[in-house]
Amino acid sequence: MRLRELIFGAIAVALLAGYAVLGGRVAPFVAPGAAATPRPARPVSAVPAPMVNGTIAFILRGDVFVLRNGQYTDRTTEGRSVQPALSADGATLYFARVEQIDGLRRTDGAVVNAQLGFSNIVRKPAGGGAEEILLKGLVAPAPNRFHDVMWLLAPSISPDGKRMAVIEGDDDGSADLVVFDLATKKPNVLSNRGDWADPSWSPDGTTLVVTSYDRGEPQLLLKPVDNRPAVLIKGIPEGEPYRASYSPDGKWLVYTLRHDDGRRNDVHAIEISSGKDIALTSDGTSWNGIFSPDGRQIAYLHADGFTIDLWVRDLGGALSDGGLGPPLKITRGEGIDGASRPAWGR
């Protein structure tokens, strides 16, 4: 999803506290059901859920929820959080939080009042506890109200927990990939006036897979963190691929394929070395897939009408031409944010 769509999606979550219709060019299309179904209330206490291994973080009505030990519960309550990430051990939670400040901007030669949007990257224990703002999108508050702000989105934590990749959005419309050393906060900029999104680390910590819109239509790129040239993933079926992440063994990517009709999305996996591509869903209303830490399952979002839920499915022998296990519904229709990919840690 491009920067402006990420921003609009973040603002929609913050202001509407729900998923509604995701209007982005590569956002999933969700068709209305035969009849409207009342949505359950936002959970205010732990919700029983099927047992899955590890910890899964997801966004529900603008807040981060964490699934572990057979229940999910909120870790934020302000309704402005998007795009969760987890450390590999599942112990630490990261996410972007949307903020705004009264300011001024020059428009067509005139100075006008403006609500300036930005986002911070926040860290806190996955089990609950105090928050820490790691990166601030309010770069330079100014007494004259011409504040310097930026969007910091899509955090992704390296396997060793020492680095964090983010997408940094600037006023010129660029969306660049930046890796921060978490100890020193020193940035390593890996693109220049790019149009990138959705970073995710390789298991060995040497490469990030991103969605690139540099040529208009989305492409999946493998970008080495030592800043060697990016490599294009080939073998993608007809359609628009986006939001990929690695398998634990580093051999596969799971990603979403938006079909040519512009209305349907499905979860696919592609073998990096061979280009072998496998459809893991075929219903046209599933997206945002991720591998489990042991590589035996995927978690993904699935829509039934306007209701989006988190599902988990055993891969079985699907990556070796076998069959998938049955899907397992995790949430209860409370309002999953369809623009935010879930995260899964041990």
Residue ranges, per PLM feature:
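Sequence signature of WD/YWTD-type beta-propeller architectures
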Residues: 2-346
